[in-house]
Amino acid sequence: MNRNKCYVNSVFPAERNTFACYYEKKDMKKLLFIFAFFGWSIPEGNAQEILTLENCLQWGIKNNLSLQTQRNEMRKSKFTISENRAKLLPQINAIANFNDNFDPPVSVTDGSSYGNPYNVTHTLQYNANGGFQLQMPLYNQTVYTSLSISKVMNEISNLSYEKAREDLILQISKMYYLGQATTEQLSLIKANIARLEELRNITQAFFDNGMAMEVDVKRVNINLENLQVQYDNAQAMLTQQLNMLKYVIDYPAEKEIALTPVDTENIQPVNLTGLSENLYEMRLLQSKETLIEKQKKMIAHGYIPSLSLTGNLMFTAFTDKFGNWFKSGPSNRWYRSSGIGLSLRVPIFDGLDKRNKNKKAQIDLANIRLAQENTRKNLQTQYVNATNDLMNNQRNFKKQKDNYLLAEDVYEVTSDRYREGIASMTEVLQDEMRMSEAQNNYISAHYNYRVTNLTLLKLTGQIETLLTNQKD
């Protein structure tokens, strides 16, 4: 090996800096590759802002447009409660009427006291009235039930918001993990490009001195060009992923962002506590079941009589000429009347309307219970599958990581042998291809492992830990 090294130095004095200190630089290269492996990168510009997963989650929860709509719906449902509560309060209305009886009606009364069988009286042509009317329910079971229904609907609105918030946390986390995986891929491709550029320089030097064929130089250039295309594609993909992330969290589109690097040595496994009994999917269905049961009660309460308090204060005037409204005197006199009473409403027959509504509600209740059973079994299946996937993905991740490191070592050995003139260019390129494949498998296994971890956090009810105790 030393003779080969001396031979190279003597034949290629111009390339002495490339070959003479190779073994002295080997440790430094490995250190650089380790940094590339873990995805450590320096932001390309001062304008880039590095966002952690926790930053993205907090920003998204506060600013996501769809979640803001859900938040407004939650606020709106509170007014529905006040709206139904207002039905229990007195309702006071002011009314006014004016009539022009151009063909006045008549009033017929007993006229025997006047020597006539009937006494016919004509109504004056013009009359007007105005005043106030009062109505207040004293007992109306339907109104009481509708108030309790509005409270359940408010609860459903709150649960819908919390579920949308949880779904947003999952969406942002998956997008963040995907962006981290692409960033990690870029770092590995960049390190591979550096390796091939060094190999190209060595091969070019060999070719210039008659120790390699032109086809070897072309092979390296082809692989180098392919890697550059992969790098450009990954860079474009990362840009799209970051743009989509900014859209989801409603981050200013003109600002440049970067993600924190992945720490593959510090992945916190989820605590497998079993499927949570407090998942929003189940709580929503339970609240909807309660809603349907109360709606059934409200239909049944429609058969119960209702009692209301009524009252009025009215002023009425009559005249035979329109101009008298603007004159004082007997022809423009207003008569006051007032009263208070009770109004009882007893339902007797509604054409079987409530009966049909009750049957529909029974079917809705049966359907919601079937949906509960289906959702429960579905979530249980998801949990079992996710648990199996977690173990499998964890095992695959460790294997692919070992394979990646092993493929890198094999490539380094083959590169050394090529520099010494022992291995062929074909062997180097084959090992480089195997190393690239191992890198891609490693990145894919890492991403799958993290996503499975995320799914189990959701199913076990621990998704909120991402906001307070997450690891990037």
Predicted stretch roles:
Residues A47-N93, N97, D103, A253, ...:
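Bacterial Sec-pathway N-terminal export signals of envelope proteins
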Residues F79, R165-N278, N393:
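Periplasmic alpha-helical coiled-coil/stalk elements that build and connect Gram-negative outer-membrane
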Residues Q68-N72, R85-A86, L138-R165, V215, ...:
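Sec/SRP-type N-terminal targeting helices
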Residues E24-K26, N441-D472:
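Acidic, low-complexity, intrinsically disordered peripheral segments
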Residues F207-M211, Y418-I422, L459:
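A short glycine-centered flexible hinge/capping loop motif at secondary-structure junctions
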Residues V215, E420-S444:
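Short terminal targeting/anchoring segments
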Residues I95-F132, T310-V346, Q470-D472:
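Small/polar, glycine/serine/threonine/aspartate-rich low-complexity segments that form flexible
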Residues M1-L57, I61-N64, I443, T468-D472:
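Bacterial Sec-dependent N-terminal signal peptides
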